[in-house]
């Protein structure tokens, strides 16, 4: 069987990464967290004292930035050059500025090429905002994952509490709404559902139920 490509897109905190990781393990595919790649570039800008809206300097930073994933339990580790930044890329500052960095054409072009290279050499589950529309337009299965703003804010709140971070629930709702607007209105590869993507609403659904539903869709599309 040739390499099989699964694209999972959707807004922030819809459950993409959680679902994609479990599916990749279940199917023995490579998990590609594209959001982590954009976060890593955003963090690299911070570490180099570059303003998040300085497109030219961030463009020049790309050639000096190696991003590496290493399998691990319970979470895949993310490396910026040789530094483990798995936790650091999830900080509030990176979260609130990654949309700006991800909107730059050169950043997207560079990372899309890296993502396609991985997909050309492996069967992958890739999640992000524009996988089915831009990165892997010929993906074998495309999923568009959604959930209500209230539910997504609750999920983010629980994640923050588990990390010892305290953020007001209403603030999280506003941040998610702002992120949705930025992601869906940017000029380059805006967040949008591919015409051939299957819509899966995770509101009120357990992780196991969503995984089972998508695994069934994938298995029905695999031709041996």
From Swiss-Prot:
Catalytic activity: CMP + ATP = CDP + ADP; dCMP + ATP = dCDP + ADP
GO aspect biological process, one term: nucleobase-containing small molecule interconversion
Superkingdom per UniProt: Bacteria
InterPro entries listed in its UniProt record: Cytidylate_kin, Cytidylate_kinase_dom, P-loop_NTPase
Keyword Kinase: yes
Entry binding sites for ATP: 10-18
Keywords: ATP-binding, Cytoplasm, Kinase, Nucleotide-binding, Transferase
Subcellular location as annotated: Cytoplasm
Membrane-crossing residue ranges in chain numbering: none
Enzyme class name: transferase
Record's GO cellular component terms: cytosol
GO molecular function, one term: dCMP kinase activity
EC number(s) given by UniProt: 2.7.4.25
Record bears the keyword Transferase: yes
SUPFAM superfamilies, sorted: P-loop containing nucleoside triphosphate hydrolases
Similarity annotation: Belongs to the cytidylate kinase family. Type 1 subfamily.
NCBIfam families: cmk
Protein name: Cytidylate kinase
Originating species: Leuconostoc mesenteroides subsp. mesenteroides (strain ATCC 8293 / DSM 20343 / BCRC 11652 / CCM 1803 / JCM 6124 / NCDO 523 / NBRC 100496 / NCIMB 8023 / NCTC 12954 / NRRL B-1118 / 37Y)
Recorded name of the encoding gene: cmk
């Amino acid at each position: 069987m040739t390499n099989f490509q699964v694209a999972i897109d959707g807004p922030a905190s819809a459950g993409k990464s959680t679902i994609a990781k479990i599916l990749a393990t279940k199917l023995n595919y490579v998990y590609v967290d594209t959001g982590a790649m954009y976060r890593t570039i955003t963090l690299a800008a911070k570490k180099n004292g570059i303003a998040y809206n300085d497109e030219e300097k961030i463009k020049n930073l790309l050639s000096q930035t190696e991003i590496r994933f290493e399998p691990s339990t319970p979470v895949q580790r993310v490396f910026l050059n040789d530094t483990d930044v798995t936790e650091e890329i999830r900080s509030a500052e990176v979260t609130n500025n990654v949309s700006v960095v991800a909107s730059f054409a050169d950043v997207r072009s560079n990372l899309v090429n890296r993502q396609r290279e991985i997909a050309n050499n492996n069967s992958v589950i890739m999640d992000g905002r524009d996988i089915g529309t831009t990165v892997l337009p010929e993906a074998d299965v495309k999923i568009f994952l959604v959930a209500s703003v209230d539910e997504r804010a609750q999920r983010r709140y629980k994640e923050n509490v588990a990390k010892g971070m305290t953020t007001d629930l209403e603030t999280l709702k506003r941040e998610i709404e702002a992120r949705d607007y930025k992601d869906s209105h940017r000029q380059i590869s805006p967040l949008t559902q591919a015409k051939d993507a299957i819509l899966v609403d995770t509101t009120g659904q357990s992780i196991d139920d969503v995984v089972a539903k998508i695994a069934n869709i994938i298995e029905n599309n695999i031709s041996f």
